[in-house]
C-alpha cells in the first residue's frame, strides 16, 4: 500500500468537485481518480447493477494500492457502501455521513439522483444525527446528463432546476444538500433561484475535513482554498479520455492528463 495515495471514483465528472475540495484544503496530495464514463450516469441504474459496478471500480482502486478510498459518488455511497468497505482493503470515506454532520437546520431538502432518493440514505443519516428533522428528498434525473454535456447555461438546465426546487421551496426548507457530486457546479444557478436565507450544503467540504486526520498535513489548515497542482494526480476514465479532459478543465482550473482504463463490463 502506497502511503497517502488517495483513490477517488465517480461515474464521470462529478467526483472532481470532491477532489478539488480536498486539494484546496490539503494541497497537492498523491491521488488516483477513476471516472467510469462508459457507464455514466449511475443514478438511473438498478441497485444490483450499481452494486456490481461499485465492486469492480473499488476493486480496481485496491489494485492501485491506494491508502484511502473516497467514494466521490453519492449513488454508490447510498447503495453500495458495504460493497466498497468489503472490496477496498483500506479505509473508505463517503459523502452521506459527511453531509449529515454539516446540517444545522430542521427543515432540510436533498437534491439527488433517482437511485439515491429511492434508497432514503440521506433521510436516514440526517434523521439519525438530527432527530425531529423534516427531510424532503427530490430526485433530479435530468441534472447529470445535462451537466456532463458541458453546457451550464442551457435553458433546459434552468427549467429542470426550477422544477426540482419547486417542492422544496413549497415545504419552506432552510437548507439544501447537494446529494450528487455533479451538483456543486449548479451552485451559481441554484443561488439565483433560491432565497438568500437557504443554506446550500456541499458534502465534499465535509469529506475534505474528514481527511485531515488521514493526511496529517503539516501546520494549521487554512480555511482559504490553497493553490494546487495536478502533477501528483493520475486520471483514468473508461471512455473518451480527451473529451473528459476538455470538460474537466473548467472544473479543476487546469487541464488534466487523462488515460483510458477498461474495466470488466
Swiss-Prot record:
Listed InterPro entries: Asp/Glu/hydantoin_racemase, Asp/Glu_race, Asp/Glu_racemase_AS_2, Glu_race
Catalytic site: 73, 180
Ligand binding (substrate): 10-11, 42-43, 74-75, 181-182
Keywords annotated in UniProt: Cell shape, Cell wall biogenesis/degradation, Isomerase, Peptidoglycan synthesis
Pathway: Cell wall biogenesis; peptidoglycan biosynthesis
Catalyses which reaction(s): L-glutamate = D-glutamate
Any one biological process term the GO annotation gives: regulation of cell shape
GO terms for MF: glutamate racemase activity
EC number: 5.1.1.3
HAMAP family in UniProt: Glu_racemase (MF_00258)
Protein name, as recorded: Glutamate racemase
Protein species of origin: Synechococcus sp. (strain CC9605)
Gene coding for it: murI
Amino acid at each position: 500500500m502506497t502511503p497517502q495515495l488517495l483513490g477517488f471514483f465517480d461515474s464521470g465528472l462529478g467526483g472532481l468537485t470532491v477532489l478539488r475540495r480536498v486539494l484546496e484544503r490539503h494541497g497537492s496530495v498523491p491521488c488516483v481518480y477513476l471516472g467510469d464514463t462508459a457507464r455514466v450516469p449511475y443514478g438511473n441504474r438498478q441497485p444490483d447493477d450499481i452494486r456490481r459496478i461499485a465492486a469492480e471500480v473499488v476493486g480496481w482502486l485496491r489494485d492501485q494500492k491506494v491508502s484511502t478510498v473516497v467514494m466521490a459518488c453519492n449513488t454508490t455511497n447510498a447503495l453500495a457502501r458495504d460493497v466498497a468497505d468489503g472490496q477496498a482493503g483500506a479505509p473508505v470515506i463517503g459523502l452521506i455521513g459527511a453531509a449529515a454532520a454539516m446540517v444545522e437546520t430542521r427543515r432540510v431538502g436533498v437534491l439527488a439522483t433517482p437511485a439515491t432518493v429511492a434508497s432514503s440514505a440521506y433521510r436516514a443519516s440526517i434523521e439519525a444525527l438530527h432527530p425531529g428533522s423534516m427531510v424532503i428528498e427530490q430526485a433530479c434525473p435530468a441534472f447529470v446528463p445535462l451537466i456532463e454535456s458541458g453546457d451550464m447555461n442551457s435553458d433546459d438546465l434552468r427549467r429542470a432546476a426550477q422544477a426540482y426546487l419547486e417542492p422544496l421551496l413549497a415545504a419552506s426548507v432552510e437548507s439544501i444538500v447537494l446529494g450528487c457530486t455533479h451538483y456543486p457546479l449548479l451552485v451559481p444557478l441554484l443561488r439565483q433561484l433560491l432565497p438568500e436565507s437557504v443554506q446550500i450544503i456541499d458534502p465534499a467540504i465535509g469529506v475534505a475535513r474528514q481527511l485531515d486526520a488521514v493526511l496529517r498535513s503539516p501546520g494549521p489548515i487554512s480555511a482559504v482554498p490553497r493553490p494546487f497542482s495536478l502533477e501528483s494526480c493520475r486520471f483514468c476514465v473508461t471512455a473518451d479520455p480527451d473529451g473528459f479532459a476538455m470538460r474537466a478543465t473548467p472544473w479543476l482550473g487546469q487541464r488534466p492528463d487523462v488515460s483510458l482504463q477498461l474495466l470488466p463490463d
